[in-house]
Each structure stands twice: as C-alpha cells, then as structure tokens.
Amino acid sequence: VRFLLGGYTADGGGAAEGIGVLLAGDPDDASAAGELSRRAATAVRADSPSWITWHPSLPVVYAALEHRGLVQAFRRIGDESFAPLGEPVAAGEAVCHVAVAPSGDTVIAACWGDGRLVRIRLDGEGRPVTAADLAAAEDPYALGGISATPPRPSRAHHVRFLPRNTVATTDLGFDLVRFWHGDGGQGSRDVVLPRGTGPRHSRWHPSGHLFVVTELSTELYALAPDPNGQWRVVGGVPLSPAALPGDAAAELAFSRDGRYVYAGLRGSNTLAVLEVRGDGAELRPVALVDAGVEGPRHHVVVRDTVLVAGQLSHEVVALALDERTGVPGRARRRVDAPSPTCVLPAS
C-alpha cells in the first residue's frame, strides 16, 4: 500500500521537506503487512503540511501548512508526485486540520492558534477560491461565571463532516464540541464537555455515535442526537486506567469491523484499546500497548496492521493487529521518516 506522509519542516522545528511517500509492502497490495520503506524524494515540497486529506472525487490533496497559517491544494501529477493547484489560502494561526465536504465544494480548516474555523469554497477543479470565517466560539464556563486569569483561549482543532448535512468541530481550549448545519451560516449548537478535558479529534462510528477523544483528560466520549436533533453526551470512559499523568491523547482510529477503538497517548507512548459495546454508547477499556515510537501523533488501521507515526522518534512503525482480541502486538516493521504527523492512504 502507498501512503502520503504529512510532517513538520524546519519552520516548525521538524526535519521533513514536504509531503513524503511511504510504502507498506507492494504499492498495489491491499495489505499493509509487508516491509516498510520511504521514498527519498518528497511527493511535493511544502512548509509543515501537518495534516493532509483527499478531495472525495478529484486527484487533489489539501494540506494545512500549520506554521504559515495557510491551506494549499496539490494536484496529483504522477503516482508519487504532486504540484500546487492555485494559490494558498490564508486560514488562521496554527491551522492544524482540514476536512473536505462530501460534495467536494468546501474545505473547513481548524486553527489551533487563534481558534478560527474557516470555510473555503472550491471550484470545479478543487482549487480554493474564497474563504470566510464561521462564528467564533465563546467559553461556556466564562459565560457561566467561572473566570480564568488569563482568560482561556479558543483552540479549534478538528473538523468532521457527518450525515444529514451536519459538521462537527472541536474546540480544545473551550471544551466544546460544536455542531453546524449546512454551511454554518446559522451558527452552531454546542455540547459542553467537563472543564479542562480538551476535546481534540472525533470519529463517526457506524452505530451512529460521534466519538470524541480529549487530549488533556485522556478520555473518550460518545455523543448522539436526541429525537429532536439536539446532540448530547451519552457515554464516556477514561482511555485506560494505566494512562500516566501528563499523557496527551492524539488520534482515534477504528478496527475495520468498528468493534474496537484505538487512541494514541503521547507521553507514555502507548495506544489505548477500547471495545464498543451495546448500541455504541458503551465503551470498555481493553488494553494499553506500546506504540513502538516516541510521540505517537497519528495512526491508521489497514486490515490487520496499525501504522503509527512517531513525530519525536522520526519513524513510522507497523504493529500486527490481532483482529480476534482487537489488541495490537509489538512493532514488527519500522522505517525512518522525518517528523511525521499524518499518515494518509494514497489511493
């Protein structure tokens, strides 16, 4: 399988030179269980493309150029090469995530540095053309009279397009999961998580629940809409009773049958494994395993393999996954990769 690698370049204190290319076994094989290798040449040079994602129907990748505060589109011009498509679009300070609407006409960018959510319109070729901010978040705890000195900053971090023309975004600084309908012009309906949890990333589960991992409290929450369409928390557990103080949660991924959830923990450098039970709202911690890297920033599941990006150890490793128990084993393959932050299947 062929993958693209996002990473930090020199402007972000990293060693990458742009978007890289990773191979797991044969490029045309559906399994990622083979030898890992990395192409010496980058797919395209870019400044700290820390998050990358595909257009749903075009051969175009969008990158959050985090330390430049820009979103750039790249068109595929070969199996392992890309070229810029249009000019980069200004987003906001420390833009850290981008997601593309299923319709393919809109990108929404989340900016950790200043809390902005920016809606970027695309033309028919996938080229970014215009940008506009969505409504800014407000700290629900400050509005409720719980003050902080200095005031807590908004930290928009993740965007997820959901069924029924809904978008979910997280605000790590204000402990919010925000739900938007349509293009977001009518504002958001917000779910407030406990103060200091720090919602980071989300995943839509086949059961109809949105799972949200909290970076600061290292928990997993299940959210669902009520019959009136109002979202609410319906379940939640710590990622693991063995998580260490100071751990910071990172990415979420599912086993291919959706029965297990995998959450990265930076600090202890582990992956927490949780089982999804009942109607999807019941979550049970199963195991905490060695991620095989330092700084497990991102991971993806490909059949019976978990690929983990070690941002601080400058490598990607492959963990064998026991699909019966859902528990990954120790790293069986590894390859050097400069400051990797995102692993994206390339086809």
Predicted region positions:
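Short coil/turn segments that connect the beta-strands within blades of beta-propeller domains
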Residues: V1, S57-P59, S103-D105, R164-N165, ...
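Conserved beta-strand positions in repeat-built beta-propeller and related beta-rich domains
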Residues: L5-G13, A63-H67, A109-W112, L162, ...
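Beta-rich catalytic cores
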Residues: A15, S48, A94, R155, ...
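Short loop/turn segments immediately following beta-strands, especially the blade-tip
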Residues: L22-A33, F74-S81, I120-A131, H181-G184, ...
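Surface loop/turn motifs at the tips and blade-to-blade linkers of beta-strand repeat domains
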Residues: A41-D47, E87-A91, A148-P151, V191-R195, ...
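Asp-box/WD-like beta-propeller blade repeats and closely related beta-sheet repeat scaffolds
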Residues: F82-H158
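Loop/turn-rich, solvent-exposed surfaces of beta-rich toroidal or solenoidal domains
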Residues: G246-Q311
